Amino acid sequence: MPARQSFTDLKNLVLCDIGNTHIHFAQNYQLFSSAKEDLKRLGIQKEIFYISVNEENEKALLNCYPNAKNIAGFFHLETDYIGLGIDRQMACLAVNNGVVVDAGSAITIDLVKEGKHLGGCILPGLAQYIHAYKKSAKILEQPFKTLDSLEILPKNTRDAVNYGMILSVISCIQHLAKNQKIYLCGGDAKYLSAFLPHSVCKERLVFDGMEIALKKAGILECK
C-alpha cells in the first residue's frame, strides 16, 4: 500500500466486514448489510477499509470498489492460536479482558486477558444445529422456537430440540467464561444474551476492533 492517508474521523471512511453470508458495513456510525449482488447499488463514495473471511465475497467487493483496502496486515493481536480468523481477531482486539462470543453462521468463543488472546473454541451456529437435526432423523426436523427459560424441561419434541441446542451453547460459554464478562456480537447475540446474566451485546464489536487497528496503524487519528 502506498503512503497511507490519515483520517481524522470515522465519518470520513467506511468499515467493511466481509462474512460468509453477508457483507457488513459501518458508515458514519450506522450499520448495514448487503448481499454481494447488491454492492454496486450502495454507491459508496468514501474510502473503504475491510476484513474478509470469504474470498468470493471479497472479489465481489473489489469488483465494485477496486480501491478498497484490506487491513489484515495493519495490526498484531498477541496470541499463540494458529489460524485465528481475522473477524475473531478484530472482535478480540476490542476487548481487553473478557470472553468474546460471535454468534453467526458459526459460534466462536474466545478468551482475552490483558489484551492477549488465550484461546477459544468453535461451535455450529444455531442454523447449523437445526440443519444437523434435520439430517439426523425426520422427527427431529423441527422449526426453531425461541425459549424464555432453561429452567423448565421440555415436554414435546420441538421444545426438546431447541432446548438441547441452546443449552449446549450456553453451557459451553459459561464453562469457559466462569465469572468473566461476556461480550456478544453476531446475528444471534441478542437471543443468547437473555440466558447469560454477565453478558452485554456489542453489535459493533468487530468494527470497534477495526477502528483500533486503524488507529494503531496511524490511518485513523486518535482523539
UniProtKB/Swiss-Prot annotation:
Subcellular location: Cytoplasm
Gene Ontology terms, MF aspect: ATP binding; metal ion binding; pantothenate kinase activity
Record: residues binding ATP: 17-24, 105
Reaction equation(s) it catalyzes: (R)-pantothenate + ATP = (R)-4'-phosphopantothenate + ADP + H(+)
UniProt keyword annotation of Cytoplasm present: yes
GO cellular component, one term: cytoplasm
UniProt pathway: Cofactor biosynthesis; coenzyme A biosynthesis; CoA from (R)-pantothenate: step 1/5
Cofactor: NH4(+); K(+)
Chain residues that bind substrate: 81, 85-88, 157
E.C. number(s) listed in UniProt: 2.7.1.33
Cofactor remark from the record: A monovalent cation. Ammonium or potassium.
Biological function: Catalyzes the phosphorylation of pantothenate (Pan), the first step in CoA biosynthesis.
Record-linked PANTHER family: TYPE III PANTOTHENATE KINASE (PTHR34265:SF1)
HAMAP family: Pantothen_kinase_3 (MF_01274)
Name of this chain's protein: Type III pantothenate kinase
